[in-house]
């Protein structure tokens, strides 16, 4: 039984197939210029899509989607894009479609980015209702993180040291008023404080 060498297989291909493979390989290595806007960007996953409206300075009849990864964004700090943000970019064709290789703002400026940040585990469930420190009343931390020594006990509703929240007259009077008139969501979340 004879064996067939690799030379015979590749040498046996018609020239047109070899040329087609070379053209496909060179097409993937070409870098193109484009501009458009951010279609969407997932800040938690770090990727999204751009809507290309111009290729090599020429308007496109129909917009084309181009994949973008956060590692390709030209900007300081946390890398992300805002929906609708104008961008200029270079891109290449890959086996998966069009992929950006570098993304900037107009004129090569840094990208603006999204105001959104991914939620960090532990902070998702925390501070949803305006939680405050039970020790000092601060809004920026909880009692276990408080830098002050333990404070005297006081009402968590009105901050008075004369009673606790269960016996708070301010809370009782507010509850009576609430039954009489409807309130907005803002009033519901922020209790009035007395000194």
Curated annotation (Swiss-Prot):
PROSITE patterns, sorted: CSD_2, ZF_CCHC
Record GO biological process: positive regulation of cytoplasmic translation; pre-miRNA processing; stem cell population maintenance
GO molecular function: mRNA binding; RNA binding; zinc ion binding
CDD domains according to UniProt: CSP_CDS
UniProt subcellular location: Cytoplasm; Rough endoplasmic reticulum; Cytoplasm, P-body; Cytoplasm, Stress granule
Flexible linker: annotated segments: 107-130
Main location: cytoplasm
Keyword Kinase: no
Renumbered residue ranges of the record's region Disordered: 98-126, 175-195
Notes concerning its domains: The CCHC zinc fingers interact with the GGAG motif at the 3' end of let-7 miRNAs precursors, more generally they bind the 5'-NGNNG-3' consensus motif with micromolar affinity. The CSD domain recognizes the loop at the 5' end. The flexible linker allows accommodating variable sequences and lengths among let-7 family members.
UniProt record similarity statement: Belongs to the lin-28 family.
Quaternary structure annotation from Swiss-Prot or TrEMBL: Monomer.
Protein name in the entry: Protein lin-28 homolog A
């Amino acid at each position: 039984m004879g064996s067939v060498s690799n030379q015979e297989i590749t040498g046996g291909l018609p020239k047109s197939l070899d040329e087609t493979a070379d053209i496909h390989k060179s097409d993937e290595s070409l870098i193109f210029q484009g501009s458009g806007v951010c279609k969407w960007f997932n800040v938690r996953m770090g990727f999204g899509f751009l809507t290309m409206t111009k290729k090599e300075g020429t308007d496109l009849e129909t917009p084309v989607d181009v994949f973008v990864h956060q590692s390709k964004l030209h900007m300081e700090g946390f890398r992300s894009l805002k929906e609708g943000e104008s961008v200029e970019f270079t891109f290449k064709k890959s086996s998966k479609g069009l992929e950006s290789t570098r993304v900037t703002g107009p004129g090569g400026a840094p990208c603006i980015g999204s105001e959104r940040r991914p939620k960090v585990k532990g902070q998702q469930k925390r501070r949803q209702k305006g939680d405050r420190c039970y020790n000092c009343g601060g809004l920026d931390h909880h009692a276990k993180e408080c830098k002050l020594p333990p404070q005297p006990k006081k009402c968590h509703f009105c901050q008075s040291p004369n009673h606790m929240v269960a016996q708070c007259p301010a809370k009782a009077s507010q509850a009576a008023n609430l039954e009489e008139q409807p309130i907005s969501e803002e009033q519901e979340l922020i209790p009035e404080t007395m000194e």
